[in-house]
């Protein structure tokens, strides 16, 4: 794997173990990113998380949160516990990807633990519409996780080296914890030291999976107050723009009730092309989205069982596969055997 680089963001991660922290001094040390422990399992809330968040933000530091995973507890319940606590302490304006800290098995096999991690990560994404990162250490990745987790970015821990060793799950990292014995002004005792790439930063995923676009128009499609040709125009959709059909109103045959940029109204069905939406079929946990339409192609995303996605086209190069868009805006190919059109 690649090593440390002076162009990377400098960071620390902290918890209640560090007590009260002077984040002004931390910033003056050149630290740019602070990851804060929020929760553990479904039973522990870090009592310093709120003050750490508010004080770090007040100094203009980039803030992220992590959850320490307990494999003997329900994964989805842990995800909800994590996000509920962030909401409880008012931590809604964080800057970095939400982190899953996995470093204990509690008797779980690599397959079982990886499945639980995926359940946690996808539940966090579902609740927050924000992106995630996996924190672990090199030997743990090699011995206790499998390559299904490789679709998520990595924050790797390995001490006393300039570059982390290769592992069987990931080929690159966006975070590297290189020491647990850092000495930073403003922090009592030792703290973990990290370098982060820009990819650790996250913005709200505002992608919306639309189910329709315009057709047979060259300029604008009028949005009307009611499904009548002489009804008041309340908005316009530029040709080629996507929007959401909400439903067909039995009071206005030949019209769709739609939503476009916070405008809800009616458009004539003559000028609407509906996309083919779909969901999973005969899938127990999740459906792999692959880079190409082959079973040995790289997995680039996953779709939870029952999740809705859009079929973009059938690619003649990959018979038996659909090119799709997930609800998070990820593109790739899924096997047609596991797809139900809706």
UniProtKB/Swiss-Prot annotation:
Keyword Repeat applies: yes
PANTHER family cross-referenced by the UniProt entry: LYSOZYME (PTHR34135:SF2)
SUPFAM superfamilies per record: (Trans)glycosidases
Keyword flag Protease: no
Organism: Clostridium perfringens (strain 13 / Type A)
Biological process annotations from GO: carbohydrate catabolic process; cell wall macromolecule catabolic process; defense response to bacterium; killing of cells of another organism; peptidoglycan catabolic process
Protein name, UniProt field: Probable autolytic lysozyme
Pfam family, one: Glyco_hydro_25
Similarity field: Belongs to the glycosyl hydrolase 25 family.
EC main group: hydrolase
Catalytic activity: Hydrolysis of (1->4)-beta-linkages between N-acetylmuramic acid and N-acetyl-D-glucosamine residues in a peptidoglycan and between N-acetyl-D-glucosamine residues in chitodextrins
Superkingdom field: Bacteria
Domain SH3b: 212-276, 278-342
Gene3D superfamilies: Glycosidases, SH3 Domains
Residues the record marks as active site: 13, 103
């Amino acid at each position: 794997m690649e090593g440390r680089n002076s162009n990377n963001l400098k960071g620390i991660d902290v918890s209640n173990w560090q007590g009260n922290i002077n984040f002004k001094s931390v910033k003056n040390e050149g630290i740019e990113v602070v990851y804060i422990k929020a929760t553990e399992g479904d039973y522990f809330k870090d009592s310093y998380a709120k003050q750490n968040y508010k004080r770090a933000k007040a100094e203009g530091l980039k803030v992220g949160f992590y959850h320490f995973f307990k494999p003997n507890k329900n994964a989805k319940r842990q995800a909800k516990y994590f996000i509920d606590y962030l909401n409880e302490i008012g931590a809604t304006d964080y800057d970095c990807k939400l982190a899953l800290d996995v470093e204990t098995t509690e008797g779980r096999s690599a397959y079982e633990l990886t499945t639980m991690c995926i359940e946690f990560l996808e539940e966090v994404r579902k609740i927050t519409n924000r992106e995630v990162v996996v924190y672990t250490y090199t030997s743990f990745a090699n011995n206790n996780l499998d390559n299904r987790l490789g679709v998520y970015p990595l924050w790797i821990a390995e001490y006393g080296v300039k570059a982390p060793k290769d592992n069987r799950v990931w080929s690159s990292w966006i975070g590297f914890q290189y020491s647990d014995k850092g000495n930073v002004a403003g922090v009592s005792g030792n703290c973990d030291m990290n370098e982060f790439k820009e990819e650790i930063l996250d913005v709200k995923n505002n992608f919306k999976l639309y189910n329709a676009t315009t057709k047979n128009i060259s300029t604008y499609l009028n949005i009307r107050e009611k499904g009548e040709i002489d009804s008041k125009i309340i908005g316009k959709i530029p040709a080629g723009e996507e929007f959401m059909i909400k439903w067909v109103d039995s009071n206005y045959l030949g019209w769709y009730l739609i939503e476009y940029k916070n405008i809800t109204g009616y458009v004539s069905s003559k000028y609407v092309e509906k996309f083919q939406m779909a969901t999973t079929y005969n899938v127990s946990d999740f459906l792999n989205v692959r880079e190409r339409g082959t079973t040995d192609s790289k997995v680039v995303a996953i779709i939870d069982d029952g999740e809705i996605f859009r079929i973009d086209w059938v690619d003649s190069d990959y018979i038996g596969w659909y090119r799709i868009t997930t609800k998070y805006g990820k593109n790739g190919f899924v096997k047609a055997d596991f797809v139900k059109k809706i």
